[in-house]
Amino acid sequence: MEWSEIFHDITERHDFKEMHDFLEKEYTTQTIYPDRDNIYQAFDLTPFEDVKVVILGQDPYHGPNQAHGLAFSVQPSAKFPPSLRNMYQELEDDIGCHRTSPHLQDWAREGVLLLNTVLTVRQGQAHSHKDIGWETFTDEVIQAISKYRDDVVFILWGKPAQQKIKLIDTSKHYIIKSPHPSPLSAYRGFFGSKPYSKTNDYLVSKGKSPINWCENGED
């Protein structure tokens, strides 16, 4: 199965077409992130049949030269966002990987779907595209992964992400929950949660190859 098969029915619906028309106006009259060409980059880099892990974010970074379609990731030239810095600190504490690039394209190519629940945002206005229709789209993506794939790890950081558990068949997938890596909550249980080693232990137990979380020089 391919993403195009999953997207076909969604994109034909009236509500999606309304959202598309709204976004056309937004991109014409506002500064919107990511660039149009990168809205669906998470799906371009991680084909449906390759998805081993889903890391769920909220909406894209809303500063210049940051968002490029992958949750938590920023463009190589950008400064490290605080949440990503904490993710990397936990990565080093968990499995000893020291990453220097804020770009997560290599994770995406390993089978980690870095999915925001909202895929666009106005510059400088967090959550400005909340409730325009993206949540319906990404909920259906999560449900399709749950239904058609087996033994996927869903990493859900923070309460908004954890609300999506209801979309996932927990009898056939593995859920990792903790507080969000944001500086506001990282010390309440994100640090020490070992999501990276837990993910790989599960994948190996199911006969799948582990994720190479360490930097591979691709960026």
From Swiss-Prot:
Active-site annotation: D59
Reactions it catalyzes: Hydrolyzes single-stranded DNA or mismatched double-stranded DNA and polynucleotides, releasing free uracil
Annotated GO CC locations: cytoplasm
SUPFAM superfamilies found in the cross-reference section: Uracil-DNA glycosylase-like
Annotated GO MF terms: uracil DNA N-glycosylase activity
Record's keyword terms, sorted: Cytoplasm, DNA damage, DNA repair, Hydrolase
Protein location: Cytoplasm
Known EC number: 3.2.2.27
Lipid biosynthesis listed as a keyword: no
The keyword Transmembrane is annotated on this UniProt entry: no
Listed PROSITE patterns: U_DNA_GLYCOSYLASE
Primary site of residence: cytoplasm
SMART domains for this protein: UDG (SM00986), UreE_C (SM00987)
Family matches, as InterPro entries: UDG_fam1, Ura-DNA_Glyclase_AS, Uracil-DNA_glycosylase-like, Uracil-DNA_glycosylase-like_sf
Family: Belongs to the uracil-DNA glycosylase (UDG) superfamily. UNG family.
Physiological role: Excises uracil residues from the DNA which can arise as a result of misincorporation of dUMP residues by DNA polymerase or due to deamination of cytosine.
Protein name: Uracil-DNA glycosylase
Organism: Staphylococcus haemolyticus (strain JCSC1435)
Underlying gene: ung
